[in-house]
Amino acid sequence: MSQTIDELLIPHRNAIDTIDAEILRLLNERAQHAHAIGELKGTGAVYRPEREVAVLRRIQDLNKGPLPDESVARLFREVMSECLAVERPLTIAYLGPQGTFTQQAAIKHFGHAAHTMACPTIDDCFKQVETRQADYLVAPVENSTEGSVGRTLDLLAVTALQACGEVVLRIHHNLLRKNNGSTEGIAKVFSHAQALAQCNDWLGRRLPNAERIAVSSNAEAARLVAESDDGTVAAIAGRTAAEIYGLDMVAECIEDEPNNTTRFLVMGHHETGASGSDKTSLAVSAPNRAGAVASLLQPLTESGISMTKFESRPSKSVLWEYLFFIDIEGHRRDAQIQTALERLGERASFVKAIGSYPTAVL
């Protein structure tokens, strides 16, 4: 007599139960070792970005499937987040309110066990870490379609904090509405200025007559719509904001560029050690004379150092002087980069190492 489906499932379910029990035992054993490490460190830094990245890269190298590498890395990010919380939960400042893409980036980098602190402005994010009310901050630095976030660059040039990580987040915008799943009757659309720009073509086609109103963040737009009694308003925000504020998804993925991506920097008080695959962010200023910029870059190009970003921004202190924000491959403690930075310092009127940090794994 042939076995039923339920009977055929029994050995697999029994095996899964056994495996789950072993996973649980090993997770708690790992947490015990994490706690012991925390005791040995004492008041030292409990978060080591280069160590976490090394673990994730090693796990991906060991992975034989069928789980994809990214899924395995996400799982172990959460494991490390929970184990780190056993040592001491981290507090992460981000541009609020709750539900912003910056909060998503913070959770992607630090895991759900970290405490996230919503701040009203990017300036306040920096202040919370500088005054040690938070351990780290996550701030948007550039978007693939709209370019750099100017206020973040301004703060990077003057803060004493160090860049210690980066987060790359795919951005999907959705049109949200309160108790209404239709585009009919929408007269106003609230969102962050960059989100409105990133959805410009879609809005022009589908809501050509709707007024576009810029607010401090996408999540703030969702909050405003959720609290409004005006049935003609809508917001552009992420799925997380829709869930938090109880809004209907009228249209999904309305961004004009399907590969829309935002890069964030993680800032803290400590320098980060080399991980083997790093970036270094710099802020430099050239003397105001002909050929100064070409001369400025010469130490990097002659050393064969690869630049992944080069952008100018007006200086806030000297009229008609510009700051150049440069990202290079490698760590500031690498001998080749140390030499290049020394030569750069001889040519520049201002040089600041914003920080060296591991390239994003997730």
Curated annotation (Swiss-Prot):
Keywords of the record: Amino-acid biosynthesis, Aromatic amino acid biosynthesis, Cytoplasm, Isomerase, Lyase, Multifunctional enzyme, Phenylalanine biosynthesis
The name this protein goes by in its record: Bifunctional chorismate mutase/prephenate dehydratase
Domain Chorismate mutase: 3-91
Organism (species): Neisseria gonorrhoeae (strain ATCC 700825 / FA 1090)
Pfam families per record: ACT (PF01842), CM_2 (PF01817), PDT (PF00800)
PROSITE patterns: ACT, CHORISMATE_MUT_2, PREPHENATE_DEHYDR_1, PREPHENATE_DEHYDR_2, PREPHENATE_DEHYDR_3
Residue numbers binding substrate: 13, 30, 41, 52
Phylogenetic classification of the source organism: Bacteria, Pseudomonadati, Pseudomonadota, Betaproteobacteria, Neisseriales
Protein purpose: Catalyzes the Claisen rearrangement of chorismate to prephenate and the decarboxylation/dehydration of prephenate to phenylpyruvate.
Domain of life: Bacteria
Enzyme Commission code(s) on record: 5.4.99.5, 4.2.1.51
Residue ranges of every copy of the ACT domain listed in the record: 281-356
GO terms under cellular component: cytoplasm
Signal peptide residue numbers: none
Site (Essential for prephenate dehydratase activity): 262
GO biological process, one term: chorismate metabolic process
Subcellular location(s) of the protein: Cytoplasm
Limits of the Prephenate dehydratase domain: 92-269
The protein's annotated pathway: Amino-acid biosynthesis; L-phenylalanine biosynthesis; phenylpyruvate from prephenate: step 1/1; Metabolic intermediate biosynthesis; prephenate biosynthesis; prephenate from chorismate: step 1/1
Main location: cytoplasm
GO molecular function: chorismate mutase activity; prephenate dehydratase activity
Catalytically driven reaction(s): chorismate = prephenate; prephenate + H(+) = 3-phenylpyruvate + CO2 + H2O
Gene3D superfamilies named in the record: 3.30.70.260, Chorismate mutase, Periplasmic binding protein-like II
